[in-house]
């Protein structure tokens, strides 16, 4: 009889999703090894160039995923985060308008630094998890279940001597690393996904939007409490239809700003003078707070990023490979669900492994196909597919809402309708999450806003949130048609009142 051994999983990518996956499977009793191309983020001297500066918005789905692995991690992250209770819309005339995310329940999303989130998650991994940084996946031999890597190695290892790029050499991993399961958590340009597509028929699509993003920053100002020159408990938006600027608060009183602008418009801002005129015309309040020089210096030196939607189906192959996070479903950032969805992938996978009674040990030879694990991974891919398609669609929809629709009277009217109907026809309380069932609320009853379902209801799948919103939108449209037939006068008075408020605000 074959001897029992722990299952061996190789996780490629030590970002937030990869680190949580490693901790989750370690807690389940698997033998875990993690490869990461970048430097170890745990050291204080971690290279800033290896730490993406963009802030992350973590909400209920992400927090619930963290709690499912270790409740203390979620609470520790909340201490590092800044709650944001709504959007603060900055109009061109300088007026500001608060739009609460949850006007009835008062729930918030949370701004947290990506480097801090990543460092804390990697720091939470025990010594039993084998971490290999500066390790780049070269190729995977799926026939023999072996992965090969190249490594950056230091030629000088004297104590206290700083590492330099020119002291690093790439060396090939000649022996390779055998595995039972390889998990690709290596982002939008996943090498694990590329290897899987060579081994199996996988549908893959990618679509770029015409906008670039550029990271800017608003320094802390000691003249204000805590250094915050703007309300720290809002996500700040300067919507300008074709483009927009957003700002998320940091713990030190600064704000991380991101400009989203069409490449075609960006090409016209080819001089410092033209860029200065652009910011003064469209974002005068931001220029006043940040300072023109700081804003323009950031604009000139910081890279232009692409925004892409990626879908991959199926996301699993046999019992040997699966994709999580951006490797499977990269999305544009306008719903703030990229991180939350990726972390939720980990919770859903763990739930399905539990449901299929996948033991952390096996008597199969290392790399041998496991029919039971294959069924579990297929179940994950099949069940998750609809939700991933839905959130990618919703993120694209919110791309238009944030830069344009938030300025529309119809947007304000719909928010008021949601508030009234939510009060009159309250949805059932959030169902308790189960280890065996990731989304216990199969059908949302009553009335609740799309934003609440997506952001604050981890018991509801994204596809159900989209289905419910389509139904509610039809109800609002039908009610509006009936109102137009039987209550033209009343509707006219209401419309005039809304228009008056709109004009006063503008």
From Swiss-Prot:
One of its GO terms (molecular function) is kynurenine 3-monooxygenase activity. The keyword Oxidoreductase applies. It comes from the Eukaryota. SUPFAM superfamilies: FAD/NAD(P)-binding domain. It catalyses: L-kynurenine + NADPH + O2 + H(+) = 3-hydroxy-L-kynurenine + NADP(+) + H2O. One of its GO terms (biological process) is quinolinate biosynthetic process. Residues 162-171 have a biased composition (Basic and acidic residues). One of its GO terms (cellular component) is peroxisome. Its EC number is 1.14.13.9. Residues 153-174 are annotated as: Disordered. Its cofactor is FAD. Disulfide bonds: none annotated. Pathway: Cofactor biosynthesis; NAD(+) biosynthesis; quinolinate from L-kynurenine: step 1/3. Signal peptide: none annotated. Catalyzes the hydroxylation of L-kynurenine (L-Kyn) to form 3-hydroxy-L-kynurenine (L-3OHKyn). Required for synthesis of quinolinic acid. This is Kynurenine 3-monooxygenase. The gene is BNA4.
């Amino acid at each position: 009889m074959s001897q029992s051994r722990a299952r061996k999983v190789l996780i490629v990518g030590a970002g937030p999703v990869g680190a949580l996956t490693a901790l989750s499977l370690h807690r389940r009793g698997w033998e875990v090894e993690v490869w990461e191309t970048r430097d170890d983020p745990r050291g204080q001297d971690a290279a800033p160039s290896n730490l993406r500066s963009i802030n992350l918005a973590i909400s209920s789905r992400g927090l619930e995923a963290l709690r499912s692995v270790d409740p203390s991690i979620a609470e520790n992250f909340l201490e590092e985060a800044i709650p944001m209770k709504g959007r603060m819309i900055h109009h061109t005339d300088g007026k500001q308008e608060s739009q609460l995310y949850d006007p009835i329940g008062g729930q918030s999303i949370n701004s947290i630094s990506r480097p801090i989130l990543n460092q804390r998650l990697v720091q939470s991994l025990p010594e039993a998890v084998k971490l290999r940084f500066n390790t780049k996946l070269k190729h995977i031999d799926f026939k023999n279940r072996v992965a090969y890597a190249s490594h950056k190695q230091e030629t000088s290892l004297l104590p206290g001597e700083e590492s330099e790029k020119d002291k690093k050499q790439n060396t090939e991993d000649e022996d390779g690393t055998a595995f039972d399961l390889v998990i690709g958590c290596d982002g939008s340009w996943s090498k694990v996904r590329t290897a899987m597509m060579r081994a199996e028929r996988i549908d893959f699509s990618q679509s770029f939007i015409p906008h670039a993003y550029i990271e800017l920053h608003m320094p802390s100002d000691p003249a204000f409490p805590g250094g915050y020159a703007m309300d720290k408990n809002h996500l700040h938006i300067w919507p300008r239809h074709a483009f927009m600027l957003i700002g998320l608060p940091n713990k030190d009183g600064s704000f991380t700003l991101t400009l989203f602008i069409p490449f075609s418009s960006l090409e016209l801002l080819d001089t410092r003078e033209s860029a200065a005129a652009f910011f003064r015309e469209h974002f005068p309040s931001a220029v006043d707070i940040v300072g023109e020089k700081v804003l323009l210096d950031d604009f000139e030196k910081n890279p232009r990023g692409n925004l892409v939607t990626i879908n991959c189906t199926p996301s699993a192959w046999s019992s040997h490979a699966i994709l999580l996070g951006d490797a499977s479903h990269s999305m544009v950032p306008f719903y703030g669900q990229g991180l939350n969805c990726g972390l939720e992938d980990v919770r859903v996978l763990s739930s399905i492994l539990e449901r299929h009674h996948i033991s952390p040990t096996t008597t199969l030879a290392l790399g041998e196909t496991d029919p039971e694990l294959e069924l579990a991974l297929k179940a994950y891919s099949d069940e998750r597919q609809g939700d991933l398609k839905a959130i990618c669609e919703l993120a694209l929809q919110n791309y238009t809402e944030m830069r344009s629709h938030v300025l529309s009277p119809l947007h304000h009217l719909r928010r008021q309708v949601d508030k009234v109907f939510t009060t009159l026809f309250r949805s059932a309380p959030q169902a308790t999450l189960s280890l065996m069932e990731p989304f216990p609320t199969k059908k949302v009853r009553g009335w609740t806003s799309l934003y609440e379902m997506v952001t604050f209801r981890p018991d509801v799948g994204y596809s159900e949130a989209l289905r419910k919103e389509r139904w509610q939108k039809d109800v609002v449209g039908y009610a509006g048609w009936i109102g137009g037939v039987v209550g033209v006068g009343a509707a006219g008075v209401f419309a005039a009142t809304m228009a008056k408020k709109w004009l006063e605000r503008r």
